[in-house]
Amino acid sequence: MIDSLERKDDMKVLMVNGSPHREGCTYTALKEVAGALEKYGIESEIFWVGNGEIAGCIGCGACAKTGEGCFRKDVVNEFVAKAGEADGYIFGSPVHYAAASGALTSFMDRAFYSGGSKMTGKPAAAVV
């Protein structure tokens, strides 16, 4: 299917590595995707969630009210700042006990809520 695509030299895909291992299997899978995108002129960047604690969303709504991101100053705000520049997203995660990594799940909950219109309507995919 990807062979039928035309070149898109002005597109950018922001990929999220949800593994606690910076250059583990999830990174390797995302690098393969990046290589395929590059063949079609699509720029990509891999954003590593990291192996530090990412607290879950508490639903306070402060990020939506202020527009300044989550009050928890961590990698979620860094991602949301980059999210507006991306045309699409790919989320990668190892599978831990039949689910995505806990860090990625908390990350996505907060990123989607605080990212608001920066992410709305843009295509996304998952690599597991």
Regions found by a protein language model. Give the residues of each.
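N-terminal beta1-alpha1 ligand-phosphate binding loop
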Residues: 11-42
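Short, Lys/Arg-enriched N-terminal segments with co-localized hydrophobic residues
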Residues: 1-10
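Cysteine-cluster motifs in flexible loop/terminal segments that predominantly coordinate metals
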Residues: 52-80
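Helix-loop-strand module that forms the ligand-binding subsite of alpha/beta enzymes
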Residues: 71-128
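Short, glycine/charged-enriched secondary-structure capping and boundary segments
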Residues: 28-31, 59-62, 103-107
